[in-house]
Amino acid sequence: MKVLAAMSGGVDSAVAAARTVEAGHEVVGVHLALSRMPGTLRTGSRGCCTIEDSTDAWKACEKLGIPYYVWDFSERFKEDVVDDFIAEYAAGRTPNPCMRCNERIKFAALLEKAIALGFDAVCTGHYARVAQDEDGNYELHRASDWAKDQSYVLGVLTHEQLKHSMFPLSDAQTKAEVRAEADRRGLSVAKKPDSHDICFISDGDTRGWLAEKIDMTPGEILDQSGAKVGTHEGANAFTVGQRRGLKLGTPAADGKPRFVLEIRPKENTVVVGPEQMLAMNEIRGIKISWAGEPIAEVGAGTEFDCMAQVRAHGDPVPARAFVTTDDDGAPLLVVNLIDPLRGVAPGQTVVLYQGTRVLGQATIDTARSLVSSSTKVD
């Protein structure tokens, strides 16, 4: 097979490419220039598209004896990922830019270009597994190392995208094993630290970064009764479940801390309350997609058992789900959680599993609490 290896400049993508070469495939490496402006390239940053990352990717390809290219996807990345991130926060929602990038860039723009150029597949350093059922349908599963598993952020992939995707690290037991393999192979990135921040916010200060992009207007912080308990410098920078950064002039009657329960961007207010009010037992999701072929119960519109996960490394909880339609006739995923989840925010993604298999995902529109009404952004 002719395989395009996406090279981030990190240890995972380097070892993934090495394993693909070792498997006998014809491999070409490509580094994606994503968040840079034309004519610039950042240095000394923890984000993506640094000179160091590009150099590390080139060194890995040179060591493996494969061609290396840099493709500039910065304009599409800005439009589909960065601008979307800003718009979602401006609307009071909490987006997942990594999932958006996988959906629009790595497994859309990159994969489309790869196939157009005659490649059979794209391989990445994601910790996940693609499998085929007895009928030849492609499925997405968790990786062997659940601590590093990234199937959550790949839950947006379609059957056709899975068909052309390779995840060579699917059977890696630990990250330490991957680093040791990189060291044995003489790859210079063996000890390179992992990246944990949003790649286009290099200093990790999401709130400060958003303040430069969104018109932040001071407003009121209210408790669940509607009484003013503090002020904020901009409602758009908060997310449901947040505690830090709240300026509360009036302490709670019980003396316990309060958390963000709701963001009302039209009113420029933030609603806070006790931690127990963050517990949600019903999620309603829009923009539904299925990883591979939908399960039979979905087509029948009946309720099915699953595990629901709302954060990349969050704990999945047992649930029952079904698909219905909203008032406008659009598909709506309803997930009833057996065990409540804390701080479920509109804009986040709920991913459904059965065993290790990813069933699909939806963007959270509303979440209903055990003790309150619903959290919704209009």
Curated annotation (Swiss-Prot):
GO terms for cellular component: cytoplasm. Transmembrane segments: none annotated. Gene3D superfamilies: Adenine nucleotide alpha hydrolases-like domains (2.30.30.280), HUPs (3.40.50.620), Translation factors (2.40.30.10). Its main location: cytoplasm. Keywords: ATP-binding, Cytoplasm, Disulfide bond, Nucleotide-binding, RNA-binding, Transferase, tRNA processing, tRNA-binding. The record marks 126, 348 as: Interaction with tRNA. ATP binds at residues 6-13, 32, 125. It catalyses: S-sulfanyl-L-cysteinyl-[protein] + uridine(34) in tRNA + AH2 + ATP = 2-thiouridine(34) in tRNA + L-cysteinyl-[protein] + A + AMP + diphosphate + H(+). Disulfide bonds join 101-199. It is found in: Cytoplasm. One of its GO terms (biological process) is tRNA wobble position uridine thiolation. One of its GO terms (molecular function) is tRNA binding. Residues 148-150 are annotated as: Interaction with tRNA. It comes from the Bacteria. HAMAP family: tRNA_thiouridyl_MnmA (MF_00144). Catalyzes the 2-thiolation of uridine at the wobble position (U34) of tRNA, leading to the formation of s(2)U34. Belongs to the MnmA/TRMU family. This is tRNA-specific 2-thiouridylase MnmA. It comes from Renibacterium salmoninarum (strain ATCC 33209 / DSM 20767 / JCM 11484 / NBRC 15589 / NCIMB 2235).
